[in-house]
Amino acid sequence: MVEARGISRRFGPRVALDDVSLVVDEGEIVALLGPNGAGKTTLVRVLTGLVRPDAGEARVLGVETWDCPRDLRARMGLVPSGDRSLYLRISGLENLVFFGRLHGLSRREATARAWELLELVDLVDAGRLRSGFYSHGMQKRLSIARALLTDPSVLMIDEATHDLDPEAAASMRGLVRGLADRGAAVVWATQRIEEIRGFADRVTLLRTGEVAFEGTVSQLVAVAVPRRYVLRLRNGRAAGRELEPAIQDAVRGRATIAAAADGDPEDFLLHLAEDAVLGEVLASLTAADVDVVACREERSEIENAYLNLAGSTG
């Protein structure tokens, strides 16, 4: 339903997208993942026909999206990041009726459709309330309702859970999952790695405008190369928070080690060099008479995979 092939786009000297391809099938959620500036929003705008690519082609339902016909545009729903298209001085109901009228519905049709969508996004009780009084989560749900006015086959959502609390974010994902289960093809752009597990069917990870990874969440986890660990050392401190010199000598050239900033006083943060092997470093510590009580990854598997592929060491 959604297909992008070899998309490239520059803004002056800056390369926003470089030979990016993406496919989203009916009933599928594809997470477009990456840090700020990776090119996610630009790709979403290319897919919806708002930005023309310098090279490559984007198609939705078999039709090229740039300068696409009005009837195709009506079959695509967009929830942009920081949506400013809502009118905050009128009610949620009035917002939906207004946009429904812009799409060619009669007032009666637009009103009936608005109430249907308010029920779908759980805003019926707030339908007549001025949308400026809505919480961030409620405004996001109203934005999704607006995107669904024409019953689109394809839904593009950019940073839907930004600034939402965990409960509101989970509600948003549940709503979108339900739409996909009813056949919608969904592109979900996000920089929040934790929200895609158990939600997205596939992942495309962008890094500085290029595709760094494409596959399932399980495949993403499989390529994780953890470099940072928390060690619990029973005899790790010489005095106060100072490290035993033997510890630094044991890991020198293969890792750095420092007292953890918080947590248990026996915890230390170990950061492996790129070519270092954890088992060998731990063996060196043991040989130096350092008692390694426990070792765990500083981050989860999926966080390690994301940060490794996105090129971050933070």
Regions found by a protein language model. Give the residues of each.
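Helix-to-loop junction immediately C-terminal to a conserved catalytic motif
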Residues: 48
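Conserved ABC ATPase "signature" region
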Residues: 97, 101, 108-126
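Conserved catalytic motifs of ABC-family nucleotide-binding domains
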Residues: 151
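Catalytic Walker B motif of ABC-type/P-loop ATPase nucleotide-binding domains
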Residues: 155-159
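ABC transporter nucleotide-binding domain
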Residues: 173-269
